[in-house]
Structure formats: structure tokens, C-alpha cells
């Protein structure tokens, strides 16, 4: 009750703030598959969106003193993704123990990410002094370090791959694959994979694989930003 972050006139016995989250997910997917000229194909288009909002209850903004509200809209996070995909495959006879399967595909992806700022009193520094912002979860601010962080961020990614899978003998399987990725914000890369499986005797198999990899940071990792202000010996520190 006597904590410097409390206002006894509002909570004479102290308080326990609560973080309430409201999450909404939306998605839609459509696809079609078939076979033509020996090629099996599968095409799809999908879209999804996630919205998470934060509402703080049983709290206060100490810097507004007894005039502080006790519930705050601290803002939220929004993410969406649109994905178009096409995969094809067919079996061909190269004279090995089994037919060789050739697979290929292409994909286009667009992503967006946005921070929704909280209401001003959820992060503001009021006239009464003390710890500013909603206690336990200050709202997202629209500007941090002189830069706006509430703008929608987006990027697109184009990729393609080809893969071969064959049984050289009844006991030896080999696989090889190439994949190309091109991100609008992070550049491009070409990766490969080789794998094999050898069964010297029935029921015993040896596997080995080697590959390279590439992973671009997510939009959330690049653009998520939040700021809180603390009162340390009468000095406000972000």
C-alpha cells in the first residue's frame, strides 16, 4: 500500500494489476490439385491475420495522482500473411531399382506487422510526478527515440525449389535438393541438401545428410519496440 508506485487515495490496501489480452485470429485458404501429362500438381492461396490487444485493469498511472484512471488500453500488435504456393512432381524411369521422383515448387509470401499505440494516459508522464505509465504494462508509444514505431511494416518473399529422390538399388536411397529465397528486405540466398539411406541388412538402416540453411529475421524481431519509464530517486529514466 505504501509502495511509491501506488496512490493510497485510490488503493488504500495496495493493488495487483492485471494484464488482459484479447486475441483474434482470421484465416482463409483455398486450393486445387490435379494431374496432367504425368505431372501431379497442387496450388493453394492462403491468408491469415492475428490481432492481440492489451487492456490493463486494477492499475493506475502514478504520475496523475488521485486523478488517475484504473483501466487502460495499452495498445496491441497486428500481423498478417498472404501465401501463394505451387508444387509439382512426377516419377520418371532412369533405370534404377525404382522410379525417380522429381519435385519442384514456387512460393510467394507477403507479411505485414504493426504496433497499435495505447491510449495516451497508458504511457504519459502526468503532472503529479512519480512512476509514469500504466503500472505492470505501460502502453505502446507511437514514437520512441524520435522515430515512429506505429507504421505498418511489410515485406515479400519469393522462393523456388527442386528436389530429386531416387533408389539407386533396393538398399540405397539418395536425395538432393536446391532452394532459392529472395526477401525484399534481407536479400537472397541459395541452399542445398544431400541425404542418403543405406540398409545393409533388412531392419537395419544408416542415414546421413548435409545441408545449408538461411533464415531471415521476422518482422517482429526487426520492428517490435516498447519503452517504459521508471522513477529512480526522483529521476525519470527510460
Question: What label would you give each PLM region?
Answer:
Residues 36-39, 93-97, 169-171, 199-203:
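Outer-membrane beta-barrel channels and translocator barrels
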Residues 15-28, 47, 59-173:
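Outer-membrane beta-barrel transmembrane domain signature of Gram-negative proteins
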Residues 2-10, 62-69, 122-127, 222, ...:
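Solvent-exposed, glycine/polar-rich loop segments of beta-barrel outer-membrane systems
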Residues 1-13, 17-37:
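Transmembrane beta-barrel wall of Gram-negative outer-membrane proteins
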Residues 154, 158, 181-191, 213:
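Solvent-exposed loop/turn segments connecting transmembrane beta-strands
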Residues 160-162, 189-204:
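Feature captures outer-membrane beta-barrel proteins of Gram-negative bacteria and organelles
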Residues 49-53, 58, 110-115, 119, ...:
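Surface-exposed extracellular loop regions of Gram-negative outer-membrane beta-barrel proteins
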Residues 41-45, 100-104, 174-176, 192, ...:
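Transmembrane beta-strands of outer-membrane beta-barrel proteins
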Amino acid at each position: 500500500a505504501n509502495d511509491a508506485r501506488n496512490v493510497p487515495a485510490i488503493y488504500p490496501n495496495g493493488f495487483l494489476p492485471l494484464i488482459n489480452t484479447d486475441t483474434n485470429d482470421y484465416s482463409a485458404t483455398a486450393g486445387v490439385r490435379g494431374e496432367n501429362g504425368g505431372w501431379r500438381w497442387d496450388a493453394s492461396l492462403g491468408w491469415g491475420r492475428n490481432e492481440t490487444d492489451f487492456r490493463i485493469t486494477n492499475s493506475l498511472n502514478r504520475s496523475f495522482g488521485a486523478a488517475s484512471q484504473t483501466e487502460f488500453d495499452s495498445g496491441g500488435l497486428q500481423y498478417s500473411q498472404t501465401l501463394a504456393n505451387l508444387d509439382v512432381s512426377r516419377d520418371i524411369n532412369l533405370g534404377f531399382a525404382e522410379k525417380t521422383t522429381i519435385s519442384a515448387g514456387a512460393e510467394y509470401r507477403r507479411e505485414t506487422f504493426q504496433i497499435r499505440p495505447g491510449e495516451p494516459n497508458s504511457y504519459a508522464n502526468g503532472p503529479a510526478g512519480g512512476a509514469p505509465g500504466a503500472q505492470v504494462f505501460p502502453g505502446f508509444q507511437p514514437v520512441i527515440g524520435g522515430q515512429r514505431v506505429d507504421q505498418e511494416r511489410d515485406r515479400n518473399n519469393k522462393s523456388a525449389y527442386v528436389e530429386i529422390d531416387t533408389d539407386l538399388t533396393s538398399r540405397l536411397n539418395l536425395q538432393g535438393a536446391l532452394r532459392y529465397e529472395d526477401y525484399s528486405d534481407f536479400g537472397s540466398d541459395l541452399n542445398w541438401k544431400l541425404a542418403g539411406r543405406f540398409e545393409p541388412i533388412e531392419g537395419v538402416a544408416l542415414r546421413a545428410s548435409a545441408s545449408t540453411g538461411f533464415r531471415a529475421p521476422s518482422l517482429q524481431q526487426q520492428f517490435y519496440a516498447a519503452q517504459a519509464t521508471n522513477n529512480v530517486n526522483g529521476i525519470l529514466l527510460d
